[in-house]
């Protein structure tokens, strides 16, 4: 009889790298970073496709005769817009003669504004004011501010009002022989006698608590009045000083101008200029008092429900060549906390005409077709990696990656994986031992693995008191790290909110502080990943060793009396009794099926956090898929000895 010894033998050479961790070690043919750095895509996107709304004009209007060539967005995104060609929120607020008057209204947690160009210097709107840019800036800023605190908003295009009997609607030559719809101009006929100057105007208007289906907790109202350079300009007929003042129901002044107590400009000019201040007023009844001759009456508002904080994105709205634009939208967004601004880098060049269908703008707005994990002033990200090469500029919302250097991201073994025989001798009760951040806090420790030669693996029975990290303890370690990170981030967020309150007057200080905190969090997260990497390697090592034990047990069971296990992973077999086909059945499973191995280990960790700063939030989806199927047998050779 000829007896031979068949053993499982390691296949490790110089191409393998050794990964030492507490609890178990691995040889691997490759390694990869736990995460790759992501690069934000320029432009706008949204966190949730079901909770956003847009306000636009002809560049987003599906009813435009040149659509889709006239559009800067896809047909899918255009469905989200409340748009009408020629319209803008400010045009609907003031209603200058001959301009589009569209009822803007809608609801959404995230509001995108791509409008404003239709009221610009090219529109040449006069009505007692040659340049409306500063009023437009304040109007857009107020819209963005209130929209960020509301779920729904709507134009209220008809306020209830009471007008004095002696006043009648007036017109102006410099307003196309008409006047604005808001404010409306009312005049009194005054005889050219000093003693007959007319009566003081007393009017009333009511801001509703609801407009249609839209709840109104706060209204944006334009308080407009004339500015005279001198008393003589207004007082040509000897009728005193000019005043136009708005009072609330308690008699408190909330807006307007009173030249009875305030000085005139002192400039030289014969024509007054109209000024409009943006007031945020609660629903209720208000009174307007004005000097004889003229009354400017608020007749419209924008109403906001103020129900929840939300996100606001403003898109630069400018003309193509040959038309003069302003940059009020840009300036308004940049001066509104939390507003994200989308800006072009090149002149507007349209496809349908010079002013509609710009390719760069289409690219910047293409992200509105998708859901992003993070949106920021630097762009949007939909990858799951928690790291980016450059710091993302605020404002930012969602699960935003932190800035990190590529070389600082831990690497994990990949490719062909083979466990070693090394164990962490400092761990005596693996089933009750939990690895976590406390291991680093209590004190640093270093585990030296001393092996003969290049190393390998050990097959055999595992004792309860043996070293190594069990799958159960690794999973508990993951859970503990997750909880530690949650506590750390929650405390950090609370601290940030308090600091924001204390230094809210210094926006740059907030930005600097936030950057420092983000850098610290990035370093902390990289440290956490180092721990997670160690747990992963230990978990995989134990899993592979379990697979080898299962393989050895399966071989012993298949052999029955034909082979005798003389040591872990080695069997003696009688070559005359068990021929090649018999051996193939036992050791190669008839060469018809792969060697049974454990399924891929679940190494997915999902760490969530509370909102970050300025409404933002940070989260991680740490996913390290490691496929172990068929890897164990590919790293093992059948060694025969006689």
Swiss-Prot record:
Q: Which family does it belong to?
A: Belongs to the influenza viruses hemagglutinin family.
Q: Write the Enzyme Commission number(s) for this entry.
A: 3.1.1.53
Query: Which residue ranges does the entry give as Extracellular-facing topology?
Result: 1-617
Q: Which residues are glycosylated?
A: 13, 48, 131, 176, 382, 539, 590
- Any Pfam family the entry gives: Hema_HEFG
Start and end residues of each stretch annotated as Esterase domain-2? 297-351
Q: Where is this region: Fusion domain-2?
A: 352-637
List the keywords (alphabetical). Disulfide bond, Fusion of virus membrane with host endosomal membrane, Fusion of virus membrane with host membrane, Glycoprotein, Hemagglutinin, Host cell membrane, Host membrane, Host-virus interaction, Hydrolase, Membrane, Transmembrane, Transmembrane helix, Viral attachment to host cell, Viral envelope protein, Viral penetration into host cytoplasm, Virion, Virus endocytosis by host, Virus entry into host cell
Q: What is this protein called?
A: Hemagglutinin-esterase-fusion glycoprotein
Q: Which GO terms describe its biological process?
A: endocytosis involved in viral entry into host cell; fusion of virus membrane with host endosome membrane; fusion of virus membrane with host plasma membrane; virion attachment to host cell
Q: Which reaction does it catalyse?
A: N-acetyl-9-O-acetylneuraminate + H2O = N-acetylneuraminate + acetate + H(+); N-acetyl-4-O-acetylneuraminate + H2O = N-acetylneuraminate + acetate + H(+)
Instruction: Answer whether the UniProt record assigns the keyword Membrane to this protein.
Output: yes
Q: List GO terms (cellular component aspect).
A: host cell plasma membrane; membrane; viral envelope; virion membrane
The terms under GO molecular function for this entry are: host cell surface receptor binding; sialate 4-O-acetylesterase activity; sialate 9-O-acetylesterase activity
Subunit-structure text: Homotrimer of disulfide-linked HEF1-HEF2.
Tell me the segments the record calls region Fusion domain-1: 1
InterPro entries linked to this entry = Capsid_hemagglutn (IPR008980), Hemagglutn-estrase_core (IPR007142), Hemagglutn-estrase_hemagglutn (IPR003860), Hemagglutn_influenz_A/B (IPR001364), Hemagglutn_stalk_influenz-C (IPR014831)
Q: Say which species the protein is native to.
A: Influenza C virus (strain C/Pig/Beijing/10/1981)
């Amino acid at each position: 009889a000829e007896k031979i010894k068949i053993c499982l033998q390691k296949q490790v050479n110089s191409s393998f790298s050794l990964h030492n961790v507490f609890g178990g070690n691995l040889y691997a043919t490759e390694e990869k970073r736990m995460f790759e750095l992501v690069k934000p895509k320029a432009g706008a996107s949204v966190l949730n496709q079901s909770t956003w709304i847009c306000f636009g004009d002809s560049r987003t209007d599906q009813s435009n005769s040149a659509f889709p060539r006239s559009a800067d967005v896809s047909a899918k995104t255009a469905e989200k817009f409340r748009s009408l060609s020629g319209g803008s929120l400010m045009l609907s607020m003031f209603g200058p003669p001959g301009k589009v008057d569209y009822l803007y209204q809608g609801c959404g947690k995230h509001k995108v504004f791509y409008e404003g160009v239709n009221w610009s210097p090219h529109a040449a709107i006069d009505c007692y004011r040659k340049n409306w840019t500063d009023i437009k800036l304040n109007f857009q800023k107020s819209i963005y501010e209130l929209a960020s605190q509301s779920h729904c908003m709507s134009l209220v295009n008809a306020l209830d009002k009471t007008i004095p009997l002696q006043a009648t609607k007036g017109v102006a030559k410099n307003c196309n022989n008409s006047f604005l719809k808001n404010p409306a101009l009312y005049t009194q006929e005054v005889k050219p006698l000093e003693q007959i100057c007319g009566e003081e105007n007393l009017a009333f208007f009511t801001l509703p608590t609801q407009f249609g289906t839209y709840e109104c907790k706060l209204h944006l109202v334009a308080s407009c009045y004339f500015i005279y350079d001198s008393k003589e300009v207004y007082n040509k007929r000897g009728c005193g000083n000019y005043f136009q003042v708005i009072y609330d129901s308690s008699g408190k002044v909330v807006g307007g101008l009173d030249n009875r107590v305030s000085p005139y400009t002192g400039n030289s000019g014969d024509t007054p200029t109209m000024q409009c201040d943006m007031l945020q007023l609660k629903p209720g009844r208000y009174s307007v008092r004005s000097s004889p001759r003229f009354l400017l009456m608020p007749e419209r508002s924008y109403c906001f429900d103020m129900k929840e904080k939300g996100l606001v994105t403003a898109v630069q709205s400018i003309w193509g060549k040959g038309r003069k634009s302003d940059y009020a939208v840009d300036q308004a967004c940049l001066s509104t906390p939390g507003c994200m601004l989308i800006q072009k880098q090149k002149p507007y060049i349209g496809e349908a005409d010079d002013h509609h269908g710009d390719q760069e703008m289409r690219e910047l707005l293409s992200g509105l077709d998708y859901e992003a994990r993070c949106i920021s002033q630097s762009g949007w990200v939909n990858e799951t990696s928690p790291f980016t090469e450059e710091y993302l500029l605020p404002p930012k919302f969602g699960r935003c990656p932190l800035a990190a250097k590529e070389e600082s991201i831990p690497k994990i073994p990949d490719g062909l994986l083979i466990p070693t025989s090394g164990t962490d001798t400092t761990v005596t009760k693996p089933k009750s031992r939990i690895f976590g951040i406390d291991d680093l806090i209590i004190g640093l420790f270093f585990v030296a693995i001393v092996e003969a030669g290049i190393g390998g693996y050990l097959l055999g029975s595992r004792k309860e008191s043996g070293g190594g990290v069990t799958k159960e303890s690794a999973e508990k370690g993951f859970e503990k790290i997750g909880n530690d990170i949650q506590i750390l981030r929650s405390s950090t967020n609370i601290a940030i909110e308090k600091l924001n309150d204390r230094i809210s007057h210094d926006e740059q200080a907030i930005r600097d502080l936030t950057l420092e905190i983000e850098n610290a969090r990035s370093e902390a997260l990289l440290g956490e990943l180092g721990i997670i990497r160690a747990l992963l390697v230990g978990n995989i090592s134990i899993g592979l060793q379990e697979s080898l034990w299962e393989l050895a047990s399966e071989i012993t069971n298949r052999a029955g009396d034909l082979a005798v296990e003389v040591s872990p992973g080695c069997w003696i077999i009688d070559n005359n009794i068990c021929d090649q086909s018999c051996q193939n059945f036992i050791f190669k499973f008839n060469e018809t099926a792969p060697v049974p191995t454990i399924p891929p280990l679940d190494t997915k960790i999902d760490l969530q956090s509370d909102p970050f700063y300025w409404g933002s939030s940070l989260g991680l989806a740490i996913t390290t898929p490691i496929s172990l199927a068929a890897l164990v047998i590919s790293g093992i050779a059948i060694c025969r000895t006689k």
